[in-house]
Amino acid sequence: MTYSIMKLIELMGDQFPLLLNTLLERMPVIVAGEDIEIVDDITESLTTLCPHRHKLVFWRDFTSESEIVSVWEEEKHNYEVSRTIVCGLSGNLRLAMDRISHFAGWILAVPLGFTVLGVQVTESTLQDVTAHVLKNSGNCGLLRVSSPSAITFSLVRPSDSSLDVEKKIVNKILVRKKQSLERIRRLLTKSLRGLDVSNHILTAVLKLDDESEKLTQDVFEEEINNYVHAARRAVTLLSRIRLARELGASTTLTERNLYEAIGWDGGELPDLIQFIRAEWHEDFSDCVKSGALSGLGAWVDSMWGT
């Protein structure tokens, strides 16, 4: 895979947070373009944007809808099992259309201008694929690849997400990467001070492209995992709030108490609730509300031993 996280951020600019949100919420994403190798490369590269999920490749890891449905059923009954992200490559497009009807969590390659198992893939085919995917999906993303360096992304239907979390992740990546690279360059420059080194050698020593890629990857994975772990703590807490309500309690949790309890301070509450719904198949929207609730904060504290 040649499309690193840093490269995707640079190429997509302001569209990257929307793409990241789409993948985190497990909406299907269609990757369409006229270079089959690049389309497949990007399709596989996008799976790295969800480092907490286990990648499955259609026709390599499974070949039928019943198999992937069983994976999803296991997710619903076991919070601890690895969540999945599915990759459908160009050569198996027709098979995917014939065998699959639910594409949540899929990234699907559509090689325009190529023939796949006897089917000529055209813009009309792309429309048919999009319509097929939308039959059982609330929304769908379309990533168009015009050239190796020209990529655009949009949703078929508007999104309600604030994208606050995704924008903060990108901002943290850029800031922390810049700070780390500046520290490294300062140390390297200091170590070479006083030496008779040509500008060519100095430039080569201070060129940190590989380190920049690695730093971006590391910071990105750290920030995504921080969000996932905070959301997982929210699931633990909210499932107990729900149990208390089922036992007759009339309490719900405030947004402030929830965020304090799980150690999270970013993003809008509806975005967190939607991510939990996508990741753990649970809807806790009735368990959290704005405003103060007497005594609940202490009860939440007691759950965590504070």
Where are these regions (language model features)?
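Extended amphipathic alpha-helical scaffold segments
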Residues: T2-H77
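A eukaryote-biased sequence property
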Residues: T48, L56, F62-T306
